Amino acid sequence: MDDGTFDVLVVGGGINGAVSALALSSHGLRVALVERHDFASGTSQESSCMVWGGFKYLESRDLKLVAGLCDSRNRLAKAFPTRLAETRFLAAMDHGAPFPPWFASLGAVAYWGLGRLATQPPRHRSRETIERLEPAVDTSLVRGGIEYSDYLLVDNDARFV
């Protein structure tokens, strides 16, 4: 590489560029990565910091995708225990929700199972419990809800890239 010759030029130092550069270089290719601004300064810096298993894909019944995303989430959590924290999420459902709370609770249990029980178990929550847990939430139209776990990065996700 002293001659400045590379096999591959990766343009963009976000998550996709970083992973591509890593994968290519791990296969013996000489890789140059260029970034217009600071490393991971674009979209990779603007995320929610969630490391999730794809809960929303249960609605389309893509169980294979959800299981794969959960496995990836679990591997990251195990590999970087000081950088990821299991976090509880509470979803309150009103009368306009696409599913009744009891059905969403079944989905949360399926999500937990597809995630190989690696997080705290999900919980069905009544309107009264949601009101007690989150007094700032207007529960006048709430029918019930679910509480489940996923992971969050504990610091700047751009640096995690």
Please identify what each model-predicted range represents.
Residues 49-133:
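Dinucleotide-binding Rossmann-like beta1-alpha1 core, especially the glycine-rich loop
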Residues 25-46:
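Glycine-rich FAD pyrophosphate-binding loop
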